[in-house]
């Protein structure tokens, strides 16, 4: 049987794969829906230059786009919330399985895990799920509206305003505000999933363990707060929880009897060197094992990983 430390690190890599898949799907859906809304709105105006708008017509144009882009965000946020709710159920199953395997105890699952998770403040934002999603929505809609108002104030050509929002094909549409929104969307989804996983663990682990250790991925992009917390041991229910910031990759590992006299590796690379080949192949496929190379998996795929996590 794997040590709890090995189980938790394997799980964290599978979780990264699930986060990648969900975050990419969410951001792609948001941008695709926004693109359709903005494109349709621009096709319905009869001006070649924003200076040709009357003030009343321009305000109606902006109000229509604001309404429709808000609808896009509300629809996609609802789908993301459904994904995080599903993740909470998956993580409840996985953590119960790991903790029961490690301790031999079969304790009851805490009630209302999802309700506790969704209403808690995310350490990275200081806000609940819904408020964090609202911040993303307001930034997205506000940036689109800002470009529209700049176009009107500066009497810009309609095509130039459209390109400033959508970007240009030769640059992969990454130069427009949609490129920024895509990145913000991935960050939001990834952070909400990290918080979901961490909160589920924090809800279940105190029934089995008294303390936990903070474990950070240490590399050239590790933040100061995660460097400082790496290796620190806290009492259950009293210490900090990831995500400490947006895109946080840190995790916590309960202090378990199975970790006695185990010398833990200093780096992820050293730990990977000691893992069974079948585990590495399942996590990374045929590429070199590293955090950037974890395979994308679905939430259903994550749910099915308990057996290999326990090897």
Each model region followed by its residue ranges:
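Acidic, glycine-rich two-metal-ion catalytic cores of nucleic acid-processing enzymes
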Residues: 162-267
């Amino acid at each position: 049987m794997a040590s709890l430390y090995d189980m938790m690190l394997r799980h964290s890599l599978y979780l990264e794969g699930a986060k990648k898949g969900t975050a990419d799907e969410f951001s792609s859906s948001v941008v695709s829906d926004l693109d359709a809304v903005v494109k349709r709105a621009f096709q319905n105006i009869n001006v070649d230059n924003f200076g040709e708008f009357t003030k009343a017509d321009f305000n109606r144009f902006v109000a229509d786009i604001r309404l429709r882009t808000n609808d896009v965000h509300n629809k996609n946020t609802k789908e993301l919330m459904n994904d995080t709710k599903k993740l909470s159920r998956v993580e409840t199953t996985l953590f119960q399985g790991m903790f029961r395997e490690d301790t031999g105890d079969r304790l009851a699952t805490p009630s209302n895990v999802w309700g506790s998770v969704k209403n808690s403040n995310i350490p990275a934002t200081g806000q609940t799920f819904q408020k964090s999603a609202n911040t993303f929505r307001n930034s997205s809609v506000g940036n689109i509206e800002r470009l529209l108002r700049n176009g009107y104030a500066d009497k810009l050509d309609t095509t130039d305003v459209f390109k400033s929002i959508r970007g240009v094909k030769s640059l992969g549409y990454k130069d427009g505000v949609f490129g920024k929104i895509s990145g913000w969307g991935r960050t939001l989804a990834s952070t909400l999933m990290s918080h979901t996983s961490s909160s589920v663990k924090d809800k279940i682990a105190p029934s089995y363990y008294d303390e936990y250790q903070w474990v950070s991925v240490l590399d050239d992009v590790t933040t100061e707060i995660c460097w400082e917390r790496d290796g620190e041991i806290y009492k259950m229910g009293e210490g900090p929880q990831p995500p400490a910031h947006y895109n946080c990759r840190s995790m916590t590992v309960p202090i378990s009897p199975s970790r006695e006299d185990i010398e833990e590796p200093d780096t992820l690379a050293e730990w990977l060197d000691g893992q069974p080949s079948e585990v590495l192949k399942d996590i990374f496929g045929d590429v070199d094992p590293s955090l950037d190379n974890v395979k994308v998996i679905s939430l259903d795929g994550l749910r099915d990983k308990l057996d290999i996590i326990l090897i």
